[in-house]
C-alpha cells in the first residue's frame, strides 16, 4: 500500500498546456511502496452508519454544481515496461440534468473520440468510422484505465448503501473509513467501494474499488482538492486537482488525471448532443 504522505510529494505542479504536461510527466515517477500507517495511532471516535451516510451526502454536495461544468483534463497512462501515453481532453457536465460529455483533443490519433452520457445512457463516438456505440459504466475511457465516473460529479449516496468502518489514519491525516455497496438497479463502474475521508476538511483522500466477488481492482488517491465558486450554486464546488489511480490487477500500471481550467459558467444548450460532437470533427 502506498503511503499518502509520500504520495503528496509527487504531485505534478501547475499544468498550463499539453506540452507542459508532457514535460512534467516525464519527470514524475511513481512513489515507492511504503508500509501502511499504524492504525493504533488513529484517534478513535464514535462513527455510526448514520454518520457515514451524512458524510457521504456531504461529499456529494461539495462536488455537485447546480449548473454547468467545463474542465481541461490531462491524463498520463503508464503500463509496465512501456512508454507512458499522454492524453488531453475536455470535460463538460450539466449536473442538474445528469448530462456528461468527454472529448479527446490530443494526441492527434485520439482527437475527436468522445463519450456522451444523458441520464442513464452512455455512448462512445469514433470519428474514424462515424459510429456511436452503447457503453456501460464499467468500461474504460479510451486507452486509459479511467472510468467516466472519475470525471463526473459524485453520486455515492444515491448509488450506494453506506456502512461506517470506524476511524483510521492515512499518513498524517485522521480519517473516517466507509464501505459502500451498490444499490440494486444502479449501473456503476465498481459494485463496492472503500473510502477514507479527512475528518477535518471532509474531503475524500483515498478510494479502493472492488469487483462483485470482492477482488480489489483499483486504488485511487486524491492529494489535493480545489474550490471553485459557483454562481448557480451560490457556493463552492470542490474539484480534485489530481487523481492518482493504481491498477491492482496489473501491478506497475497507473493513471494520473490532472484537472485544470475548471469553469462553472453556463454552456450552450445544444452542446450535449451527438450532432454537436460530430461537428467538432468535420
Segments from the language model and where they lie:
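Bacterial N-terminal signal peptides that target proteins for export
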Residues: 1-11
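Bacterial N-terminal signal peptides
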Residues: 9-19
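Gly/Pro-enriched, hydrophobic low-complexity segments
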Residues: 135, 155, 171-274
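Broad, structure-driven detector of short, well-ordered beta-strand segments within folded domains
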Residues: 91, 113-117, 195, 257
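Boundary at the C-terminal end of the N-terminal hydrophobic targeting segment
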Residues: 20-24
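N-terminal, post-signal-peptide region of Sec/Tat-exported proteins
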Residues: 67-98, 202
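N-terminal post-signal-peptidase region of extra-cytosolic proteins
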Residues: 101-108
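Flexible, processing/modification-adjacent segments and terminal tails
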Residues: 31, 38-68, 74-75, 83, ...
Amino acid at each position: 500500500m502506498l503511503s499518502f504522505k509520500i504520495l503528496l510529494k509527487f504531485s505534478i505542479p501547475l499544468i498550463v498546456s499539453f506540452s507542459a504536461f508532457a514535460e512534467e510527466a516525464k519527470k514524475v515517477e511513481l512513489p515507492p511502496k511504503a508500509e501502511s500507517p499504524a492504525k493504533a495511532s488513529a484517534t478513535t471516535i464514535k462513527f455510526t452508519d448514520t454518520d457515514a451516510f451524512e458524510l457521504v451526502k456531504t461529499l456529494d454536495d461539495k462536488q455537485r454544481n447546480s449548473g454547468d461544468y467545463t474542465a481541461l483534463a490531462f491524463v498520463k497512462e503508464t503500463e509496465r515496461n512501456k512508454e507512458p501515453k499522454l492524453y488531453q481532453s475536455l470535460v463538460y457536465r450539466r449536473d442538474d440534468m445528469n448530462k456528461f460529455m468527454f472529448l479527446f483533443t490530443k494526441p492527434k490519433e485520439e482527437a475527436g473520440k468522445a463519450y456522451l452520457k444523458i441520464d442513464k445512457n452512455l455512448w462512445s463516438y469514433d470519428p474514424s468510422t462515424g459510429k456511436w456505440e452503447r457503453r456501460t459504466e464499467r468500461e474504460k475511457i479510451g486507452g486509459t484505465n479511467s472510468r467516466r465516473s472519475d470525471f463526473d460529479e459524485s453520486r455515492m449516496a444515491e448509488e450506494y448503501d453506506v456502512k461506517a468502518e470506524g476511524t483510521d489514519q492515512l499518513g498524517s491525516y485522521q480519517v473516517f473509513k466507509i464501505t459502500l455497496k451498490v444499490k440494486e438497479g444502479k449501473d456503476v463502474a465498481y459494485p463496492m467501494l472503500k473510502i477514507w475521508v479527512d475528518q477535518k476538511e471532509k474531503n475524500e483522500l483515498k478510494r479502493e474499488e472492488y469487483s462483485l466477488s470482492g477482488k480489489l481492482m483499483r486504488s485511487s488517491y486524491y492529494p489535493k482538492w480545489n474550490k471553485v465558486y459557483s454562481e448557480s450554486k451560490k457556493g463552492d464546488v470542490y474539484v480534485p486537482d489530481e487523481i492518482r489511480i493504481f491498477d491492482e490487477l496489473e501491478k506497475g500500471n497507473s493513471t494520473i488525471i490532472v484537472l485544470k481550467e475548471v469553469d462553472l459558467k453556463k454552456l450552450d444548450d445544444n452542446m450535449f448532443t451527438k450532432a454537436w460532437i460530430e461537428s467538432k470533427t468535420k
